[in-house]
């Protein structure tokens, strides 16, 4: 009826002026208000009358719009939408006479809009996953995906998983935020450099390590890893260049190095230890926090991140990442170097070499510290140095564990620390 009624109206109107359309829109707005009032007062009869009038106007407006676009075929559609929307959606839509438009757009927007965000998140997440670099860029969304990726990588890495979950101190979204923060913070501080460097490293790391895959996963998976690990890697490299960063990062490496053997032995446990021990650097406290779980520790570290500050967080991040990464690496190495872990540092070195990405990173470190093999000792040593720096920061108790696990490294630590 409404359609039939609208068409005659349109024909009867003849010329359609903007003023007439605006007036009708105003009338529709008034009708909507009346409908809402009627609904509130429980006057269903009046409400239905207003709805019919409103629907008629909307159909008419839709017809005008369609006729202007030569899309008479769509005429039925607006009425259909208008009917429901007019009575229901429109009434609630509120004054806007365009309610129909609103409703339709709302529907489209609501339907499409949210999907878009989701898709964006997915795409972002996906992109970040695939494009670790995007992660660095997009950070949050990508981080989200990254987190997802991290979670997966972490799942793959277990430690990472813990790490991711831990990292997600915020956990899940927070993780993203934290990760974002971690990346943002660490990356913000180191991130930019790490990111840029990292990207190169990333490529190298990713390429360097088939384990890198794991590493990548750390990067990709722990895309903060990526963001930071590579940065760590970079930082390790760059930072080793910058021993401070190197120290921070290296300590993580070191713990992994130190930890790796044990990590390898019981990376998870070792994680706890490593993180407790390996994390002796500032991470120690933090790592211990993180590492107590190894995962929660991360979560804690992230909290620590904020607490420690970007530098520390970065260190922690680096350590996390590295340790996390190392953990990953360690774990990865486990996978890679399950045997090497047993072998010990050299094996670890080998493991890292196995991870070659890691050695690459070590190389990054190595350049600072020396060849991969030597790096490794250097690494531990470098870490020792850096770690020493850390160690002072960290409580002795964790250190002793490191010492125990890393009696060898500790010597280095001692040397470096000195």
Swiss-Prot record:
Residues 225-251, 328-337, 345-366, 376-393, 404-418 have a biased composition (Low complexity). Appears to function synergistically with RBM14 as a transcriptional coactivator. Isoform 1 and isoform 2 function in nuclear receptor coactivation. Isoform 1 and isoform 2 function in general transcriptional coactivation. Component of SWI/SNF chromatin remodeling subcomplex GBAF that carries out key enzymatic activities, changing chromatin structure by altering DNA-histone contacts within a nucleosome in an ATP-dependent manner. It comes from the Eukaryota. A motif (SH2-binding) lies at residues 50-53, 374-377, 413-416. The record marks 366-367 as: Breakpoint for translocation to form the SSXT-SSX1 fusion protein (rare). Keywords: Acetylation, Activator, Chromosomal rearrangement, Nucleus, Proto-oncogene, Repeat, Transcription, Transcription regulation. Residues 309-318 have a biased composition (Basic and acidic residues). InterPro entries: SS18_N. Pfam families: SSXT (PF05030). Sequence repeats lie at residues 344-356, 357-369. Residues 77-118, 188-418 are annotated as: Disordered. It is linked to A chromosomal aberration involving SS18 may be a cause of synovial sarcoma. Translocation t(X;18)(p11.2;q11.2). The translocation is specifically found in more than 80% of synovial sarcoma. The fusion products SSXT-SSX1 or SSXT-SSX2 are probably responsible for transforming activity. Heterogeneity in the position of the breakpoint can occur (low frequency). Belongs to the SS18 family. It is found in: Nucleus. Fairly ubiquitously expressed. Expressed in synovial sarcomas and in other human cell lines. The fusion genes SSXT-SSX1 and SSXT-SSX2 are expressed only in synovial sarcomas. The modification N-acetylserine is found at residue 2. This is Protein SSXT. GO terms for molecular function: transcription coactivator activity. Residues 344-369 are annotated as: 2 X 13 AA imperfect tandem repeats. The record marks 410-411 as: Breakpoint for translocation to form the SSXT-SSX1 or SSXT-SSX2 fusion proteins. Interacts with MLLT10. Isoform 1 interacts with RBM14 isoform 1. Isoform 2 interacts with RBM14 isoform 1. Component of the multiprotein chromatin-remodeling complexes SWI/SNF: SWI/SNF-A (BAF), SWI/SNF-B (PBAF) and related complexes. The canonical complex contains a catalytic subunit (either SMARCA4/BRG1/BAF190A or SMARCA2/BRM/BAF190B) and at least SMARCE1, ACTL6A/BAF53, SMARCC1/BAF155, SMARCC2/BAF170, and SMARCB1/SNF5/BAF47. Other subunits specific to each of the complexes may also be present permitting several possible combinations developmentally and tissue specific. Its main location: nucleus. It comes from Homo sapiens.
């Amino acid at each position: 009826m409404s359609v039939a009624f609208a068409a005659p109206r349109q024909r009867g109107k003849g010329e359609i002026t903007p003023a007439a359309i605006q007036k009708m829109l105003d009338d529709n707005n008034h009708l909507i208000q009346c409908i809402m009032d009627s609904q509130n007062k429980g006057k269903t009869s009046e409400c239905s009358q207003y709805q019919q009038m409103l629907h008629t106007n909307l159909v008419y407006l839709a017809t005008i719009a369609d006729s202007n676009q030569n899309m008479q075929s769509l005429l039925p559609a607006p009425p259909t939408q208008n009917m429901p929307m007019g009575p229901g959606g429109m009434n609630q839509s509120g004054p806007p006479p365009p309610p129909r438009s609103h409703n339709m757009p709302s529907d489209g927007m609501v339907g499409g809009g949210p999907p878009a965000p989701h898709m964006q998140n997915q795409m972002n997440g996906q992109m970040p996953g695939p494009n670790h670099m995007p992660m660095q860029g997009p950070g949050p969304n990508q981080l989200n995906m990254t987190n997802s990726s991290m979670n997966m990588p972490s799942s793959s890495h277990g430690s990472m998983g813990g790490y991711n979950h831990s990292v997600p101190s915020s956990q899940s979204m927070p993780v993203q935020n934290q990760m974002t923060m971690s990346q943002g913070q660490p990356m913000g501080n180191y991130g930019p450099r790490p990111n840029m460097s990292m990207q190169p490293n990333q490529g190298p790391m990713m390429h360097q390590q088939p384990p890198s895959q794991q590493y990548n996963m750390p990067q990709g998976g722990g895309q903060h890893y990526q963001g930071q690990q590579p940065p760590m890697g970079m930082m390790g490299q760059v930072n080793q260049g910058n021993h401070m960063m190197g120290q921070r990062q290296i300590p993580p490496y070191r713990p992994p190095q130190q930890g790796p053997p044990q990590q390898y032995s019981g990376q998870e446990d070792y994680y706890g230890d490593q993180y407790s021990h390996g994390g002796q650097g500032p991470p120690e406290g933090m790592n211990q926090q993180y590492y107590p779980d190894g995962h929660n520790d991360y979560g804690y570290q992230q909290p620590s991140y904020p607490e420690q500050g970007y530098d520390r967080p970065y260190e922690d991040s680096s350590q996390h990442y590295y340790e996390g990464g190392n953990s990953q690496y360690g774990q990865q190495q486990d996978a890679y170097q399950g045997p090497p872990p047993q072998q010990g540092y050299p094996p670890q070195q080998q493991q890292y070499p196995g991870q070659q990405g890691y050695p690459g990173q070590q190389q990054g470190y190595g350049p600072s510290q020396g060849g991969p093999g030597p790096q490794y000792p250097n690494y531990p040593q470098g870490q020792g140095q850096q770690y020493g720096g850390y160690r002072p920061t960290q409580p002795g108790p964790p250190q002793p564990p490191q010492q125990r696990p890393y009696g060898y490294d500790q010597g280095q630590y001692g040397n470096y620390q000195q």
